[in-house]
Amino acid sequence: MVIINKKRIQIIMACIFISLFAFSIQMSQTQNNTQRTNSNNNLVETTSTPVSGKTIVIDAGHGVPDEGAQSSTGTTEAETNLKISLKVQNLLEQSGCTVILTRSDENAIYDVDSNTLKQKKISDIRNRVKIGNESSADIFVSIHLNKIPQQQYYGWQCFYKEGNEQSNKLAKSIQENLNKSMQKENNRVAMKIDNIYIIKHVEIPTSIVECGFLSNPEEEKQLLDDNYQNRLAW
């Protein structure tokens, strides 16, 4: 099994963190400079990071028994999604953000009375939506990897719910930061979509982030190349 390089994951999660940071500025610019009263009843200006005090749901897509996409060499989407999500969680928490993970281990979050794979997948996705809607969170970000029959495609793609302006801004923020930091030749823009269950039913600002194509063998080879890793880290 090919293991996604740690430096690559660090770059991905840093870009996502920066994007959430930027989006939080857009959501609440007034929170950058708040006011409080000192003991002499004088107004004192205080500052905090834009994500400080925010609650963000990070959704690592798929999970055993549903591994999601898988490359020809055995790299699984579910495992990589979780690695990225845990690192994003760590960065956000260091900045004073409360992070809710839909899953924190290899397993999907289906109900115990689910028996077939189909039942488990349906239960899992509904539970993810439930977490998002009951969390009172500010943002919901779902981490995924892509795979299609054509092998030539590579790069990032972010999706959001049509007609939801805040989700639109969130997805655009993530897409633009990933393009600038990882693949300047990637000219994709965030896309609206309405046939994904999480996108349709999570009520807070939501974006699905497809972090790359497991179907592209050259992209996967690059993940193991030292020079490419160094360029990403730079």
Which residue ranges define each predicted feature?
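Catalytic-site microenvironment of enzymes
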Residues: 1-234
